[in-house]
Structure formats: C-alpha cells, structure tokens
Amino acid sequence: MATRRNPTKESITTSPPPDQQPRQPGELEHREAIQLRDLPGYPQQVLWKLIIYSIAVLVLPLSAYFYSVNYVFDGNTTYAGATAAITANLILFSYIVVAMREDKGDQEQLREQQQLRGNKEETKKMK
C-alpha cells in the first residue's frame, strides 16, 4: 500500500523557474551560440550511405534467399538460408570498409588543415 506524503513537511523552493529568472544582457545569445555549436551535424553523404546500406541489408538477403531456394537449390532451405546469411555479412563487411575509408579520409584532411595552419603561422613569424 502506498504511503501518503505530508505536503507541509516537504521543502518548498521559492526561486522562480529558470525561464522566468532575470537574465544578464548577452546571456541568451551566448547560450544560443553554445547550443548551435554543440548540435551534431552529419554530412548528407553519410546519411545517404546509411540509408542505402540499411535498405540493402533488408532487401538483398531476402532476395538472395528466395532466388536461391526457388532457382538454385530447388527447395533446399538450408543452403538458401546460408546464402542469405553470407549476403548479409558481405553487406555488413562492405559498410565497415566504406566507413573506415571515409574516416581515414577525414583524418587526412584534418592533418592537411593543421599543416596549412602551421605553414601560415610560420610565414607570419618570418614577416
């Protein structure tokens, strides 16, 4: 059985809610800038790859199963299931390889940018 709370014993806060508290000038803009900077931005290319591979993981193994059970193995579902499993694993492996290549490309671009910044700083020091 649930116990009843006595509301008089509970502590009551007297501070106004955060949205009604007085703000300093510029505080709101600073918070908005932080929130916008912290939003995750995913490149459209990455999202399209994810969508395409998701559809491929659903469609290709099922297609491989039904094609192989009807036309290749003449009703043997064991081999057809193995074919579907191999197809799904190949798609997953190819997605991992593509993701690793993309990540290496991003790391190389970051190194190049750092080198360019270093070269610019050196030229500024020389002047």
UniProtKB/Swiss-Prot annotation:
Disulphide-bonded residues: none
InterPro entries: Vma21
TM region(s), chain numbering: 46-66, 80-100
UniProt KW Transferase keyword: no
Motif segment (Prevents secretion from ER): 124-127
Domain of life: Eukaryota
Lumenal side stretches: 67-79
Topology, Cytoplasmic side: 1-45, 101-127
Keyword Endoplasmic reticulum annotated: yes
Keywords of this entry: Cytoplasmic vesicle, Endoplasmic reticulum, Membrane, Transmembrane, Transmembrane helix
Region Disordered, annotated ranges: 1-28, 107-127
Basic and acidic residues bias spans: 118-127
Any one GO biological process: vacuolar proton-transporting V-type ATPase complex assembly
Membrane protein topology class: Multi-pass membrane protein
Compartmental location: Endoplasmic reticulum membrane; Endoplasmic reticulum-Golgi intermediate compartment membrane; Cytoplasmic vesicle, COPII-coated vesicle membrane
PANTHER family: VACUOLAR ATPASE ASSEMBLY INTEGRAL MEMBRANE PROTEIN VMA21 (PTHR31792:SF3)
Family: Belongs to the VMA21 family.
Role this protein plays: Required for the assembly of the V0 complex of the vacuolar ATPase (V-ATPase) in the endoplasmic reticulum.
Protein name (record): Vacuolar ATPase assembly integral membrane protein VMA21
Species, as recorded: Coccidioides immitis (strain RS)
